[in-house]
């Protein structure tokens, strides 16, 4: 696999190595050994995933921007196995030089790209195809009492979701998240969330 660093430290794009022939293709979607060998040195620590999730959504669905509060913080490794999504990570670590900045990447069933979102980031995606199946690995279990979010529709984040407003489809919960300017982040750049 090939690791691509982004403009925000720790946020990574992972390009798997595909083997193609007349029958189709094959690739390892995840190898703990290779992730440890190639990603951990860039991050400066290991990431041990413990839960896999999958969602299916239709065009215009926007999920996010979600995170889990300490001590239940999560890193995520995400990919789109059917359709197309725009996936976004937003830095919400107080004191970070990239606080409020984001990285956006299009994940598709054809490009097979994976996106690593570290702890201390809010995560969300928008479905750009008729339907999309989205998978993600987490390094902490889901804890509903630690749920948090910032508004996926916050214009100050400068995210072009590629979805016309009239087609945006959000859950009731996601419509109630705060704007970044009103948000008191539980994350701090000086606190190591991986210890």
Q: What role is predicted for each listed range?
A:
Residues 1-110, 131, 138-195:
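Non-catalytic, conserved peripheral segments adjacent to functional cores
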Residues 107-131:
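Conserved metal-binding segment of the jelly-roll/cupin
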């Amino acid at each position: 696999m090939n690791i691509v660093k982004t403009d925000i430290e720790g946020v990574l794009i992972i390009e798997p190595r595909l083997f193609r022939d007349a029958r189709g293709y094959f690739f390892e979607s995840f190898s703990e050994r290779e992730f440890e060998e190639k990603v951990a040195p860039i991050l400066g620590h290991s990431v041990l995933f413990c839960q896999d999730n999958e969602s299916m959504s239709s065009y215009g669905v926007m999920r996010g921007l979600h995170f889990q509060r300490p001590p239940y913080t999560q890193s995520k490794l995400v990919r789109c196995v059917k359709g197309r999504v725009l996936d976004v990570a937003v830095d919400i670590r107080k004191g970070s030089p990239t606080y409020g900045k984001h990285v956006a990447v299009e994940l598709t069933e054809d490009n097979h790209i994976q996106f690593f979102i570290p702890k201390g980031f809010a995560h969300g995606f928008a479905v750009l195809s008729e339907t999309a199946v989205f998978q993600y690995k987490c390094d902490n279990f889901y804890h509903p009492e630690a749920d948090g979010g910032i508004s996926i529709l916050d214009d100050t984040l400068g995210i072009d979701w590629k979805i016309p407003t009239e087609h945006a489809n959000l859950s009731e919960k996601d419509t109630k998240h705060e704007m970044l300017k009103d948000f008191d982040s539980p994350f701090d750049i000086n606190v190591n969330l991986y210890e």
